[in-house]
Regions:
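Single conserved hydrophobic/aromatic residue that forms the stacking wall/gate
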Residues: 1-13
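Short, low-order "capping/linker" segments at domain edges
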Residues: 93-114, 135-149, 166-190
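Ordered, amphipathic secondary-structure segments that act as subunit-interaction surfaces
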Residues: 64-111
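Conserved short beta-strand edge segments in small beta-sheet-based binding/regulatory domains
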Residues: 79-91, 120-127, 152-166
Length: 190
C-alpha cells in the first residue's frame, strides 16, 4: 500500500482526558498548543473535578497513532497539565448534549412525541416554540436534529463530548503524566 493510504487507514477518533490546574488561562494554553501544531479539535468540554483545584478537559480529535502520541507528549510538557490519558474507545462512557429550539405552531404534540422517542425533554415551551434538551452519543444527537429540521430549527447548540473510563479505573495525578489504552490504535512505545 502507498504510505498515504496506509496512514489514512490507521486514522482513528480518540478522546483524551486531561486533568489541569483550575486556573485562569489554562484552557488558552492547551488550545494554543493544538493550534500552534496544526491539530484540529473535533470536540472540547471543560469542567471542574471532584477536587476544585483541578479541571478535566475532554478533547476529541481524529488522528493517526503518531499524532496522538505527539499530542500527549506535548500536553504533558505544559506545566498546568497534571495528567493526560487517551481513553479506551470501547471502555469509556461518553455523552454530549444538544439544545434545539424549534418552531412549534400546530405541530406541538407531534414534536413532543418525536422528542420522546429520543428521550429528549422540553425545557422551554412558548406559544410559538419549544426548546428540547437531548443527551447521548453523537449519532443519536445527529438523528434527533435531523428529525427536528423539517419543523424549522430556530436555534441550536451542542456541547463537547464528556467522557470517563468505565469501571474502577481513575486518573491519578500522582502517577504517569500520560497513558495509553490497550487497543489497536496504541503506539508501540511512549
Amino acid at each position: 500500500l502507498h504510505p498515504r493510504v496506509r496512514r489514512q487507514r490507521q486514522m482513528c477518533i480518540r478522546d483524551r482526558s486531561i486533568v489541569v490546574r483550575n486556573q485562569p488561562g489554562v484552557l488558552m494554553r492547551v488550545a494554543g498548543m493544538f493550534s500552534r501544531r496544526g491539530f484540529n479539535i473535533d470536540s472540547l468540554a471543560v469542567g471542574i473535578t471532584q477536587n476544585p483545584e483541578f479541571s478535566r478537559m475532554t478533547v476529541t480529535m481524529q488522528a493517526d497513532d503518531a499524532t496522538i502520541k505527539q499530542v500527549c507528549k506535548q500536553l504533558a510538557k505544559l506545566v498546568e497539565v497534571e495528567a493526560v490519558k487517551v481513553l479506551p474507545p470501547k471502555a469509556s462512557a461518553k455523552r454530549s448534549m444538544v439544545m434545539v429550539k424549534v418552531h412549534a405552531g400546530d405541530k406541538r404534540l407531534e414534536l413532543l412525541r418525536l422528542a420522546d422517542v429520543f428521550r429528549a425533554h422540553a425545557v422551554d415551551v412558548t406559544g410559538e416554540s419549544l426548546i428540547f434538551l437531548a443527551t447521548g452519543i453523537d449519532d443519536k444527537l445527529n438523528a434527533f436534529v435531523d428529525v427536528m429540521r423539517p419543523y424549522g430549527i430556530l436555534e441550536m447548540v451542542q456541547t463537547g463530548l464528556v467522557a470517563l473510563e468505565r469501571g474502577d479505573a481513575a486518573m491519578d495525578v500522582s502517577k504517569s503524566r500520560y497513558s495509553w489504552p490497550e487497543s489497536s490504535c496504541k503506539p508501540s512505545a511512549i
